[in-house]
Amino acid sequence: MTTVEVPHGSRSVILTVSAVVEETADTRSIVFAVPDELRDKFAYRPGQFLTLRIPSDRTGSVARCYSLASSPFTDDAPKVTVKRTSDGYGSNWLCDNIATGQTLEVLPPAGVFTPKSLDHDFLLFGAGSGITPVISILKSALTQGGGKVVLVYANRDEKSVIFAEELRALAEKYPTRLTVVHWLESVQGLPTADQLAAIAAPYESYEAFMCGPGPFMDTVHQALNTVGMPRARVHAEVFNSLSGDPFADQAPVEVSDEDAADAATVEVELDGEVHKLSWPRKQTLVDIMLAKGIDVPYSCQEGECGSCACTVLEGKVEMENCDVLDPEDIEAGYILGCQARPVTDHLKIEF
């Protein structure tokens, strides 16, 4: 049995695996037992993810992000779902080795792929394991909202459909609110933008969320653009491989008297509270908020996960790495707090 007893950093915790579910031949769901004293720390929103520290003989460990397939409104415990990939060390290790009773080091929930309100009509797209955060949103919207939900779910073949029985049961439970459209490559081939546009056309007024391989999401973007859905209502989840160690505590950036004198000022709104801060130009937004003891959302601190995404309302920043953001996101004012440094003297930012 693999066990972990001591956290690697101050933010992570050790959780026990309470169940492992074989969803398909190459997919496992991992359910975690969260002690009462950690309930608040591991409260999450539909569509978020957990970062797991996975043992490795080569490097000691690797960090991987996996979406929560559970809903905070319908499931008693958080559950991530992992699909084996041919070249994925983390997914292969988990599918081959993880078992009930083992422990893993885990960072608290993070991510911005989550609806601001569940009381909308939703058009959801998932491909393969991209269904994982999507089904969390789907279940949450059905139980907490009053709108309709349409899911377009693409897979290689019928055997590779994750959560097939759960989706069937939900469709029976909510016959007037939930529509599930399955797309099987073995039967229909890969979906084209025109084909997806034809499916999406009646739902142009809905909120769209998508997750899946890059080519699939590119096709969905084209389809939604064709039907005229505003970019502000289109949300995509993108995962990049983590190059750094999000579990390690970061050393504070030293600020000289000269740097402090030249600092910008920023008003940051987080969870309805406004913080007025001095922002030295060598420090990132996450740096200064952590230094002030503010519980800012973040994970990798490498600009690779999007956990710290926020919006600039006034002012301008520069970012070293922002590949996880689409050009449309940047144009809309989205930034990454772990990469953002001030350019202008005064800024307003909202999480």
Swiss-Prot record:
Residues where [2Fe-2S] cluster binds: C300, C305, C308, C338
Name of encoding gene: kshB
Catalytic activity: androsta-1,4-diene-3,17-dione + 2 reduced [2Fe-2S]-[ferredoxin] + O2 + 2 H(+) = 9alpha-hydroxyandrosta-1,4-diene-3,17-dione + 2 oxidized [2Fe-2S]-[ferredoxin] + H2O
Protein name per its UniProtKB record: 3-ketosteroid-9-alpha-monooxygenase, ferredoxin reductase component
UniProt-listed PANTHER family: 1,2-PHENYLACETYL-COA EPOXIDASE, SUBUNIT E (PTHR47354:SF8), NADH OXIDOREDUCTASE HCR (PTHR47354)
Taxonomic placement: Bacteria, Bacillati, Actinomycetota, Actinomycetes, Mycobacteriales
GO biological process, one term: cholesterol catabolic process
The species this protein was found in: Rhodococcus rhodochrous
Cofactor(s) demanded: FAD; [2Fe-2S] cluster
Gene Ontology MF annotations: 2 iron, 2 sulfur cluster binding; 3-ketosteroid 9-alpha-monooxygenase activity; FAD binding; metal ion binding
UniProt entry tagged with the keyword rRNA-binding: no
